[in-house]
Design a protein with these regions (language model features):
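A structural signal for short hydrophobic beta-strand segments in well-ordered beta-sheet cores
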Residues: 43, 181-184, 261
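Short, flexible loop segments at boundaries between secondary-structure elements
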Residues: 45-46, 167-172, 247, 254
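Conserved alpha/beta core of the MobA/IspD/sugar-nucleotide pyrophosphorylase nucleotidyltransferase superfamily
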Residues: 2-4, 193-281
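Conserved beta-loop-beta/alpha segment of the NTase-like Rossmann-fold superfamily
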Residues: 95-181
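Conserved core of the sugar-phosphate nucleotidyltransferase
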Residues: 144-228
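Aromatic- and Gly/Pro-rich amphipathic surface segment
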Residues: 33-41
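Conserved N-terminal catalytic core of the sugar/cofactor nucleotidyltransferase
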Residues: 1-10, 16-34, 47-133
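Cofactor-binding loop segments of dinucleotide-utilizing enzymes, especially the Rossmann-like FAD-
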Residues: 11-14, 74, 139, 164, ...
Length: 281
């Protein structure tokens, strides 16, 4: 029986390019727009409380039982470190052990090399992650406490992910159509992750309950099993990045029935564009 360790890796090293491009067209206050133009979207003040998404996500993680957080940020980041430093000592989040990992950008690139590379660099900087289990997720999605808890629960499979019911996601249909679909076997093990499948093939992806399941980039992984796959992940020919889903595809091709899919019916608030800011109370 696998008993996952309470480690959470949050990927927040991106440059928030889609958010910044959308600022002109969004109906948000000048204060929020100014913040969004300067800092990572996970640090934008949200709702009446002005509590940013990263604080909300870490609160959910803490309530779910996580005690250590590895926050992957851009190589020259100061904003996340300043946010953490300025949190009052009385804030419950200060009970977390938080470590910063920095994703360096290669000299010949303007942007980081992708999510698989982010994890690889974090595991180099914190070698304990190469020998332990951890949950990894995006820094711009507000994952529910139950999803985070599910990935901490004892299980038989070494790795796991949350398989979201596509019908539960309250996004525009065109946006949902862009999400990767999961292929699962009858026992609920991951067989594949397919990006932007053709409309006429959708019926082939329904699970035993007749549901279409999508990945929202939240996984529970064994570091010793996945480290080499992150290191050796090929660069996607279109996006020109090393992507976590591709590393996972390569892994399950060689090690089938090692990633358990846990179904979930829930909406997942996120901050892809400036229009999403108003969805947070």
């Amino acid at each position: 029986m696998i008993r996952p360790q309470p480690n959470l890796v949050v990927m927040a090293g991106g440059v928030s390019s889609r958010m910044k491009k959308s600022l002109r067209d969004a109906s948000i206050s000048s204060e929020i727009a100014a913040a969004a133009a300067k800092v990572h979207k996970a640090l934008i003040p949200l709702g009446k409380s002005k509590r940013p998404l990263i604080a909300r996500l870490l609160t959910h993680a803490q309530k779910a039982g996580y005690t250590k957080v590895y926050l992957i940020v851009a190589e020259h980041d100061t904003a996340f470190q300043q946010w953490w430093k300025q949190l009052p000592a009385t804030d419950p989040l200060k009970k977390l052990q938080l470590y910063f990992a920095f994703q360096n950008t290669p000299n010949n690139r303007e942007k980081p090399l992708g999510t698989a590379d982010a994890l690889y660099q974090a595991m180099l900087q914190y070698p304990q992650l190469q020998q332990s289990s951890f949950t990894v997720c995006n820094g711009d999605n507000l994952y529910g406490i139950d999803s985070l808890q599910q990935l901490l629960a004892p299980r038989s499979a070494p790795n796991a992910l949350i398989a979201y019911d596509r019908e539960g996601l309250q996004y525009p249909a065109a946006r949902i159509a862009q999400f990767a679909l999961l292929q699962m076997d009858a026992q609920g093990f991951l067989k594949g992750i397919v990006e932007k499948p053709k409309l006429e093939t959708l019926e082939n992806f329904r699970d035993t309950e007749g549901k279409l399941r999508v990945s929202m980039n939240i996984f529970s992984l064994q570091g010793d099993l996945l480290f080499s796959y992150f290191r050796d992940c090929p660069i996607d020919p279109v996006r020109q990045e090393k992507e976590l889903p591709q590393a996972l595809r390569n892994y399950i091709q060689e090690q089938p029935k090692t990633v358990r899919c846990f179904p979930q019916y829930a909406h997942l608030p996120d901050l892809t564009s400036a229009a999403d800011v108003s969805s947070f109370a």
